[in-house]
Amino acid sequence: MNMKSYLKILLVTLILASCGQKEQEPFWLGADLGWITQYEAWGHKFYTKDGQEMECTALMKELGLNAVRHRVWVDPSKYGNWCSKEDLLVKCQRAKALDMEILLDFHYSDWWADPAKQNIPASWSGHSYEQMKQDLWNHTVEVLNYLKDNGITPKWIQVGNETRNGFLWSVKSNKFGWPELDENGNTTITESMGHVDRNPEQYAGFFATGYEACKSVFPKSIVMVHLDNGFDKDLYDYNLGVLKDNGAKWDMIGMSLYPFWALDGGFRTDEDQVITDCIENIKYVSKKFGCDVMIVETGFLVDESDPARMERSRSQLARTIRESINNTNGVCKGVFYWEPECRPSQYKLGAFTEDGRPTVIMDAFKDWSE
């Protein structure tokens, strides 16, 4: 073989090799923006730091983010229809137009679902376990097909939101939907259908049904289990062990990480240690369960009257991003801030001012090196 022929073969080989290489994904920096359409309906506006008005999703991209997270409720008609599938589509279309990836968060409730409450949708109440699995399947497929028919493909899909105690179980609630507390400050479970402690097999069965429903519409989307308290190794051992032992599977683990709430709830006494423990837990659960991890919710205290506290919050977010990238052996794929755009008077762990401008906390998304 002459040199000319050899060089041609070498060139073709190199071209084919380069074509076969999978493009490395970026580290995902995201925000949960579920409130934005509701804020807009209230007349609230968003601005760059220098006062230029900008739509919130576009502003997030300007601030260095490349992904969004949006929740969906089953029948939120009693709650203004926010986070219905129609409202969800509006928000997802904005993200798609900006080439931002989408994380879809199924709450499987008519309103908020979290560790304290996972109330069964009103239209599913009283159904048997098998009927409720069909309800879950139908709702999941309906929402996903609605998105698909409108050109939206979520990169990630959560089956449940912060399912520390399982999902599709109900507590006694007041007329506004909030749990009623007894004299000892505890909630009263009125229906334990998918509770992890009381009906572990059914919790796993619901999750497995949700997983398969997601894959039936979007087989390439990454389906996620999401728990709170990312620093709590024992929680993840127990809950994910229940799912695995009862035949459920997932593609990725999602974590919530809130150092402020960890202290406020008495789980820890040092905010920085909460972050340290979460990073260690990311590596632990990834190795034990054989999958990647993302921090799908985080947030840090906003107090503009205290510049030192604001800088500390910025530094904590920067550290969370930095260590997720550099200190998890590549298994942590992203960090999402929960509702950074919200007003501090409404929620104190956002990252914007009362008049809709990003605070110094948001600087961490572009400069997380220190």
Question: Over which residues does each language-model region extend?
Answer:
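Boundary/entry segment of secreted carbohydrate-active catalytic domains
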Residues: E23-C56
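Substrate-binding cleft and catalytic face of glycoside hydrolase catalytic domains
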Residues: L59-N199, Y203-I222, D228
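Sec-dependent signal peptide recognition
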Residues: K4-V12
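Acidic-and-aromatic substrate-binding clefts and catalytic sites of carbohydrate-active enzymes
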Residues: Y39-E40, H44-G51, V74-E86, R164-F167, ...
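C-terminal motif of bacterial Sec signal peptides marking the signal peptidase cleavage site
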Residues: A17-S18
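Short, acidic/polar
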Residues: G43-K61, L136-Y146, D232-L243, L317-I321
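Aromatic-rich peripheral "rim/lid" segments of glycoside hydrolase catalytic domains that contact
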Residues: A41, K45, W112, N174-G185, ...
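Glycoside hydrolase catalytic-domain groove-lining segments
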Residues: C56-T57, S216-H226, G230-D306, N326, ...
